[in-house]
């Protein structure tokens, strides 16, 4: 893999509900490596179930273990590659349109626009015990079942996950931001 990065356009099934979910994604030793790191506007949440992956986020490199959750921030160059075992994980990609509110609303000003503009970046490796895993598991279930009003449930779970990240100081500020 070279040091160049390539823009990755993320397709969504429904443009009105811009979330993409890849459940039980598998990467094997035979999966071809990407030519370059990629980036996109969407926030990406990776939840690892088995095996291990080599995750690159910007200049940081990680080797995953089952149960871990990783965040790829908007516009962050990244890659996920096979490292060992039977690698199975879920990938959630949420476009900024899914979590934006009204332009002058307090949550939009204090959090959502700050995330999109990279003034707030989440730590890539997230504690995988307890609440974050429960939120992601529920989000995956709601999206898969697609019961009435599932869009509201999924959106609320994404916001709940961001609230957990923000409340537990799972962020790294890229610039000084006053709220």
Stretch-by-stretch model annotation:
Residues 44-47, 131-135, 157, 164:
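Amphipathic, well-ordered alpha-helical segments in soluble domains
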Residues 120-128, 143-157, 163-179:
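Short, Lys/Arg-enriched, Trp-marked, Pro/Gly-tolerant hinge/linker segments that flank
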Residues 55-56, 72, 78-85:
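Short beta-strand His + acidic residue motifs that chelate non-heme Fe in jelly-roll/DSBH
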Residues 2-21, 25, 81-141, 167:
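A hydrophobic/aromatic-rich effector-binding and dimerization subdomain
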Residues 72-73, 94:
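A conserved hydrophobic position in a structured secondary element of the catalytic/binding core
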Residues 1-68, 108-110, 120:
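Generic protein-terminus/edge-of-domain signal
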Residues 38-40, 138, 156:
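Residue-level recognition of hydrophobic positions within alpha-helical transmembrane segments
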Residues 64, 70-72, 126:
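Hydrophobic beta-strand core residues of beta-sandwich domains
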């Amino acid at each position: 893999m070279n040091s160049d990065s390539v823009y990755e356009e993320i397709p969504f099934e429904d443009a009105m509900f811009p979330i993409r979910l890849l459940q039980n994604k598998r990467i094997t030793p035979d999966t071809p490596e990407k030519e370059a790191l990629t980036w996109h506007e969407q926030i990406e949440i990776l939840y690892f179930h088995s095996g291990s992956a080599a995750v690159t986020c910007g200049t940081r490199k990680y080797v995953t273990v089952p149960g871990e959750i990783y965040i790829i921030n908007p516009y962050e160059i990244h890659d996920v590659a096979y490292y060992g075992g039977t690698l199975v994980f879920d990938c959630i990609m949420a476009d900024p349109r899914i979590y934006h509110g009204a332009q002058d609303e307090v949550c939009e000003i204090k959090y959502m626009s700050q995330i999109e503009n990279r003034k707030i970046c989440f730590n890539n490796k997230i504690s995988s015990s307890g609440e974050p895993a429960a939120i992601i598991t529920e989000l995956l279930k709601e999206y898969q079942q697609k019961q009435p009003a599932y869009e509201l449930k999924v959106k609320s779970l994404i916001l709940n996950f961001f609230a957990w990240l923000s409340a537990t100081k799972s962020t790294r500020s890229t610039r000084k931001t006053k709220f």
